[in-house]
């Protein structure tokens, strides 16, 4: 709604009779008191389809593999959770899902990966970009660069790459 506010103020400052109205929507599905935000349904379907396609690629190989997919969601894990809708040949995809609403524990993550690899040769992991440790720090935090989007939010990225390194180490 920040953009709507700016446009409205600009129109008023130049004496325009244009009235600007905002329709709140977000594919993150994180608007309070809203069951499903406009845009979330199609984004959730896309995520589920993307994970199905990723599984098609991963499951053809006999070599054990761990595929980590970082999904948009700084403060709401709805899109990451939508990955649970993916299925291929009756198999659950992804096998592991980590949401930003629950504190992330690296040791538990490694245990989960090892347990999943005992059951299946290829595993797929969905992780929200905004997962945090119990002390509130972003996992694989790359916000230290100071870069921000046009709304002043620090860019988040790197959780997938960080977890890749963690899996490789252990």
Predicted regions and their residues:
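Acidic/polar active-site rim loop that often engages polyanionic ligands
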Residues: 23-36, 62-64
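Short hydrophobic alpha-helical runs that function as membrane-insertion/retention elements
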Residues: 19-21
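Accessory alpha-helical/coil subdomains and C-terminal extensions
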Residues: 2-17, 37-170
């Amino acid at each position: 709604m920040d953009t709507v506010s700016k446009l409205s103020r600009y129109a008023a400052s130049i004496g325009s009779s244009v009235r600007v109205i905002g329709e709140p929507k977000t594919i993150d599905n994180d608007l309070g008191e809203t069951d499903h935000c406009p845009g979330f349904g199609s984004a959730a379907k896309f995520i589920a389809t993307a994970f199905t396609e990723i599984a098609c690629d991963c499951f053809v190989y006999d070599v054990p593999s761990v595929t980590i997919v970082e999904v948009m969601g700084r403060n709401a894990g709805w899109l990451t959770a939508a990955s649970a809708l993916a299925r291929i040949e009756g198999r659950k995809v992804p096998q592991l899902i980590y949401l930003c609403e629950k504190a992330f524990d690296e040791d538990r993550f490694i245990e989960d990966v090892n347990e999943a690899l005992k059951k299946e040769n290829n595993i797929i992991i969905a992780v929200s970009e905004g997962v945090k440790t119990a002390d509130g720090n972003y996992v694989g935090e790359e916000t230290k660069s100071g870069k921000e989007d046009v709304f002043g939010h620090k860019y988040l990225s790197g959780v997938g790459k960080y977890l890749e390194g963690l899996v490789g180490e252990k």
